Amino acid sequence: MDNETGKTFLDMARERWSVRKFTPEQISDVHMARILEAGRMAPSACNYQPQRVLVLQSDEAIARMRSVTHWAFNAPTVLLVCADLAESWKNVDGCDSAEVDAAIALDHMMMEAWECGVGSTWVRGFDERVMRQAFGIPATWKIVAMMPMGYPAESARPSIWHFKRKSNEEIYRFI
């Protein structure tokens, strides 16, 4: 189905790239609401919705984030996406869906951000213990990733790795 820009999801997936340079402008309330709604509407196992997201926007929160990892870049907003292991579906062999569910929510927010003209990148480059302590993350939450985001700087460009894609034959196996 086409969105208001007339682009399909596949168009956006092909266009989107990891933005690592941002303007200092804070994300508008309208865009932020749309991005967060996309995460809320993401599918999850048995609709348990274990995703928990810290929205870091205050100067103090961003400074704290930058003190524990340099991978926040100069983003004016960082989402710290977690999975509540106490509120997630587990299958009969104990496999917990929480991290996958939170990752799906993160991806939904990332794609909606792109639709809004907001760039982002998926980051797992941090010490979880330090991050947990810095932001008072509950013991039942697993930190899945952080998503620095903001409006792309004029000088922002995709990395050289963005254009390297495996072939269908390397990825898919029809049985």
For each of these PLM feature ranges, what is it?
Residues M1-I175:
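Acidic, surface-exposed loops and disordered segments
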